[in-house]
Amino acid sequence: MREAKDGVLISVHVSPGSKEVSFSYDEWRRAVEVRIKSPAKEGKANRELLGIFRQIFGEVELVSGEKSRSKVLKGKRE
């Protein structure tokens, strides 16, 4: 995690198609490791990922990595 002008940036590594949703921290990648159920097709995995993070943090957007397993999310300050 690192601070941004109007929020916080979160580095995430996503593993789609998992049996259950889980979180861990990957020290080597310096990223939150997230396993999600949705497949990486037609944006389904991105929608599930954003939905999970929005439940936890509120307003969240995908900054980079739309078609990659390595993503950067931005949590906005209120």
UniProtKB/Swiss-Prot annotation:
Gene3D superfamilies, sorted: YggU-like (3.30.1200.10)
Pfam families xrefs: DUF167
The protein's name in its UniProt record: UPF0235 protein AF_2072
GO cellular component: cytoplasm
InterPro entries according to UniProt: DUF167 (IPR003746), YggU-like_sf (IPR036591)
PANTHER family the UniProt entry points to: UPF0235 PROTEIN C15ORF40
SMART domains attached to this UniProt entry: DUF167
HAMAP family for the chain: UPF0235
Signal peptide: none
Domain of life: Archaea
Stated family: Belongs to the UPF0235 family.
